[in-house]
């Protein structure tokens, strides 16, 4: 951990990228545990459990708080960014996922034998609130643990 910090002095950025990567990597085993299906595409796609976007922005905000303080402008910007990203993940993109699922079902039922398109819409775009909370917790707690190691 210390060698990584020496190479890249921005600890908040290191923490954010680390927890984004971990959250992306965890998606495949979690999907297998829940659905008994291995889907390696989850490593490079949006959506799923946990929210890697939430992990990233919460790790960044936590790093900014630890590095610059809770009263800093940097922390305020990171918190605002985190709120926007998490709202988008659980709200707007989740709604788009539901619409894609319904449109795919309509196409399947309405145009049986007469496909209008071979390509289906991607249904896994957003996150449930729980997936966002888990991602956020990973980012916050993970960054706190990393910071502790960096301080020793």
Protein language model regions, located:
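Helix-loop-helix hairpins and the membrane-proximal interhelical loops
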Residues: 1-25, 33-36
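General secondary-structure edge motif
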Residues: 2-5, 9, 31, 83, ...
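Membrane-embedded catalytic cores of phosphoryl/pyrophosphoryl-handling enzymes
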Residues: 21, 25, 40-152
């Amino acid at each position: 951990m210390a060698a990584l910090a020496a190479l890249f002095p921005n600890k908040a950025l290191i923490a954010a990228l680390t927890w984004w990567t971990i959250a992306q990597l965890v998606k495949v085993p979690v999907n297998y545990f829940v659905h008994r299906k291995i889907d390696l595409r989850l490593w490079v796609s949006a959506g799923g459990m946990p929210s890697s976007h939430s992990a990233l922005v919460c790790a960044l905000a936590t790093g900014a708080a630890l590095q610059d303080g809770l009263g800093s402008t940097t922390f305020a910007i990171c918190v605002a960014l985190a709120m926007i990203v998490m709202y988008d993940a659980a709200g707007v993109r989740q709604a788009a996922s539901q619409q894609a699922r319904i449109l795919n079902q309509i196409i399947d039922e309405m145009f049986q034998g007469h496909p209008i398109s071979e390509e289906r819409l991607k249904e896994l775009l957003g996150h449930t609130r729980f997936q966002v909370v888990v991602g956020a917790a990973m980012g916050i707690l993970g960054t706190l643990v990393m910071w502790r190691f960096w301080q020793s």
